[in-house]
A protein has these predicted regions:
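Patatin-like phospholipase
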Residues: 1-20, 28-177
Length: 177
């Protein structure tokens, strides 16, 4: 989200956005002309249950209650900046590009992490998180022939490996101490 703030501060407005998973959601919010500061406030409203039971599927509204009202009446064609998001057809095992029609079902599809959120039925398919196949859809962005692509990978690698030799060290790390 900091990248959006820097782009806004520098007066840089992309002519096209592509995203997958949470990047698709952030892209949709930004493409609908919501300022970066407001997107950050919306993101602070995201709620992941403290006690998540693996295999128990959550609802979109449980996790993203602040985003739903902002996107539910939009279509891709209404956006100020063209947007494409990727999802994966669960049965065919292929990447699907979504860039027309109602926005919210497409965003639910690109964010539908298997085992956390249910697959999104869309166009006769059952779609899940695009990150299952393509974490950083740079190829998707280039397919629209832009002059420049700015890619942001929010799944960072650790800067250093920490060896936890003692049981106490492992517990302290788990507790954030």
């Amino acid at each position: 989200l900091g990248v959006l703030e820097v782009l806004e501060t520098e007066g840089i407005r992309p002519t096209f956005l592509a995203g997958t998973s949470i990047g698709g959601l952030v892209g949709a919010l930004w493409a609908s002309a919501i300022p970066a500061a407001e997107i950050i406030a919306i993101a602070r409203g995201f709620r992941f249950p403290r006690r998540f039971v693996p295999g128990r599927v959550l609802s979109w509204e449980q996790i993203f209650p602040t985003a739903v009202p902002r996107l539910e009446h939009w279509a891709f064609e209404d956006l100020g900046t063209p947007l494409v998001v990727s999802a994966v057809d669960l049965l065919a095992g292929e990447e699907v590009m979504l860039h027309t029609g109602p926005l919210l079902p497409a965003i639910r599809a690109t964010c539908a992490v298997p085992g956390v959120l249910p697959p999104e039925p869309l166009g006769g398919r059952r779609l899940v998180d695009g990150g299952v196949m393509n974490v950083l859809p740079v190829d998707l962005a280039w397919s629209w022939e832009p002059e420049i692509v700015i890619a942001v990978n929010i799944i960072a690698s650790p800067r250093q490996t920490v060896r936890l030799d003692s049981r106490y060290a492992r517990i302290a790390t788990a507790l954030g101490r």
